[in-house]
Amino acid sequence: MIFHVCALPHTHSTAEYLACAYTAKVINFCRMMRSLGHQVFLYGGEKNEAPCTEHIVCVSEADRAAHVGDNHFTSASFDYNLPFWTNANAKMAAEISRRAEKQDFVCVIGGYAQKQIADALPHMITVEFGVGYGGTFSKFRVFESYAWMHVCYGAATMGKPHDADGNWWDVVIPGYLDPAQFPFSAEKDDYYMFIGRLVDRKGYRIAADVCFDLGKKLIVAGQGTPPLGAEYVGVVDPVTRGKLMSR
């Protein structure tokens, strides 16, 4: 099979940007599909570390950096009406058109922000291959979990839950990881760890409260404002993450 994978234009498909869950999804998807012998064409920024048949640059580093600005890249705007998004989407659609056959798959990871790509290629099958977000549009969707699939179903009914049928071909494929990034260590240290975006719904405050009550050390990694009393290590790279988790 042949997959045309559209990366997020405001990141690079490199280890430096793995704090973005959807960029990590793109890299792991490319690695997995190439390992199975499929062809993978990857469309994105100037830098790439994901295994692929061809890497097609559709966004200049100057444009990417200007869009992100002084923000952390995970806080970049997803306003698909901005020229940054319309230009990136148009370029990706044009490059896909030069390479694709009708039976190929177009794989998008940005939800509505990349719908313009699907609209420009109506003769092709566009798949949202990692739906863990709310702005979903495609007829063909792969959800991250059953819980999130049902959230999306319910949200789409506008308060009429009995209308939440979905499609019979909807599927859940849980997130996939590279085992090499999570080494085992028989030697352990005495601490707990939370890693993720530091927003309430991720539960980091619960981790902090539990560790406080137990009198235990808590190491916190991720974007945001850490809780008081925790050792904050910032946004960590895959090597540091692997070491912290292994201990």
Model-derived features with residue positions:
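Catalytic cores of nucleotide-sugar-dependent glycosyltransferases that transfer UDP/GDP/TDP-activated
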Residues: 1-247
